[in-house]
């Protein structure tokens, strides 16, 4: 492209830059409990850090499309000052995955689904608990685009304790436990990732 006019070269590099995956995507089953709560929580915490320029989103492998946050998880969200409403569940697609620099899942079934449907995105996929365990003692902040590789090198196979159980229709205690785990693990990501501005 060396012979192209400078205005075209600049436009192409800008297009390439803007099309690079740069967001965080949370994936669970219905996209109304774990991933939706994590999405709301991380967005809120990044906003509190001064509007870090990272898109945060969520989707489900069997989404309850169009539904808001589950009522028990919404109660957990409100308890920590989040609105707990305004979410709209969506089905995970290849296009959604392409936009994410980091894909964060909650159970082995989510990894299996991505491996079956969109295996090319496994290199950017980690379990939330797995990421928290691997990054917890990190000496330096890890650039967002390098997180999945770093986590997969340090902890290639998530242990049972690194998965977060689905609280859907399991009552307020299950929702409380899931929300607490998500907040704790997302907190570790907040403290150990070098977030782009």
Task: Give the location of each predicted region.
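Short polar/charged helix/loop
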Residues: 1-197
